[in-house]
């Protein structure tokens, strides 16, 4: 059974700016993968301990999809999306 997926404002802002159709399709596929199995990806440590990051490739570049989850209500919050460069620094802000 799939989990319910919610988007944060940060994620929506980045998603709206995507212009390449293949990147949008790859992002949608990554979101579906996370919704079907939230344990995919890796859990971060330290300051970002509640964050799960799923890595995927699009057009030869590595992208990261950051999410948090509520296990009791089976809800996933999409927190951030972007290339690896400065991804974690921007999330800490």
What are these regions (language model features)?
Residues 24-27, 38, 63:
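Hydrophobic alpha-helical segments
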Residues 1-6, 41-46, 53, 77-78:
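Alpha-helical interaction segments
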Residues 17, 33-34, 81:
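Conserved catalytic core of Hanks-type protein kinase domains
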Residues 10, 39, 86:
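Residue-level recognition of oxygen-bearing side chains
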Residues 1-30:
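Arg/Lys-rich, positively charged N-terminal/basic patches that mediate binding to nucleic acids
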């Amino acid at each position: 059974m799939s989990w319910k997926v919610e988007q944060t404002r940060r994620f929506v802002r980045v998603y709206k700016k995507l212009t390449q159709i293949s990147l949008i399709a790859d992002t949608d596929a990554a979101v579906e993968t996370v919704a079907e199995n939230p344990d995919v990806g890796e859990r971060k440590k330290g300051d970002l301990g509640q964050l799960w990051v799923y890595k995927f490739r699009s057009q030869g570049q590595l992208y990261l999809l950051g999410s948090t989850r509520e296990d009791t209500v089976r809800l996933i919050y999409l927190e951030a999306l972007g290339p690896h460069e400065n991804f974690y620094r921007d999330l800490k802000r």
